[in-house]
Amino acid sequence: MPEFTYEIVETLGTLSETAKGWTKELNLISWNDRPAKYDVRDWAPEHAKMGKGCTLSPDEVILLRDLLNEIDL
């Protein structure tokens, strides 16, 4: 697996937490020194490990927001 680097630029919020302390978070993350993108992903306590996630550009976040606003909850 290729090596990569990341920096959590800003923590925007926690969506959920498991009994083992893993959290699903929305963060602004810079991957491999590139401009930061929005990222939803599971994190172990202290961000020691990460699970699979979904990275979104600002334009994709706007579209997602619009789609979510159309849902009748």
Where are the language model's segments positioned?
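Positively charged, low-complexity terminal tracts
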Residues: 1-73
